[in-house]
Amino acid sequence: LLTLASTTGCGSQEKKAATAPPQVVNITYVKSPLNIPSIIDKNINTVSKAFAKTNTGINFPEINSGAKQPETLAAGSLDICSALGGTSAILAASNGVDVKIIGIYSRAPQAFNIMSKNPELKTLADLKGKTVAGPKGTILHQILLAGLDKAGLQASDVELLSMDIPPSVTAMLNENVDAALVAGADVLRAQKAGAHILANGEGLVDATIVIATSNKFLQTHPEAIKQYLEAHKENIAFLHKNQAQAYEFTAKATGLQPAEVRAMAPWYNFDPTLTPQDLTELEKTQEFLLKAGLQKNKIDIKNLIVKL
């Protein structure tokens, strides 16, 4: 585990660069699966107000793809990934992207589900020889493989069609596939249309989503990173103190009813503190990626993490 003190330079020019606030910071806005702190920020502008104190402008590009966030980070047009799947962060780092994890966005094993509309399919063991739709190389994919292994099956026992969550749900509801990998608000959408849950991440993976930045931005603007994390914590505090309003914001952003948001909110642990258990989960994630053939180069997960 790296500390900020060990990753910042000591020369006078480096100190000057580190203390000069950036003119603009680009931070992803990702509301799925149910990113309540981000939705709160969209409504009360906590991050923008915090950076206004240093005359720093904020852009919030909506980049939902876990693969595209690190690509944009590497290109220099993104500074902070507000909510990035642990799978995506590890894959990016193994492919040479100089990404650093600076906190945890959420842990939500119950929010990531394998679902089916076929009443004959009741457990993951029933998926042998079946077709599943969902995004490859993601937390959902990891849950599928871990669940199949627990059920005594192999990845080759099912056919996985790689597609985003909404079309996966549609394909399942239209009975074009036997099951789908589903998260967040789409779980309720699928249930309302007659689908049921075969399994979720409980007992398999913690479904860790991280907060990340580029090492270059961290080195150049460590104070901006701290500024962002403090503002993010304020959004989490708002959630705890003003639940009803937070759920109203989230319902409006997702198309859910406030009561549905209230039912789903307990699935999520938004504590940003990175714990030893989080490190263990990220190491488990790397093992999944290597075993699935999605990752070629093994990395030291501890070197991926910076504690501020």
Language-model features and meaning:
Residues 20-25, 49-62, 77, 150-162, ...:
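A local structural motif
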Residues 87, 157-161, 165-250:
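Pocket-lining segment of extracytoplasmic ligand-binding domains
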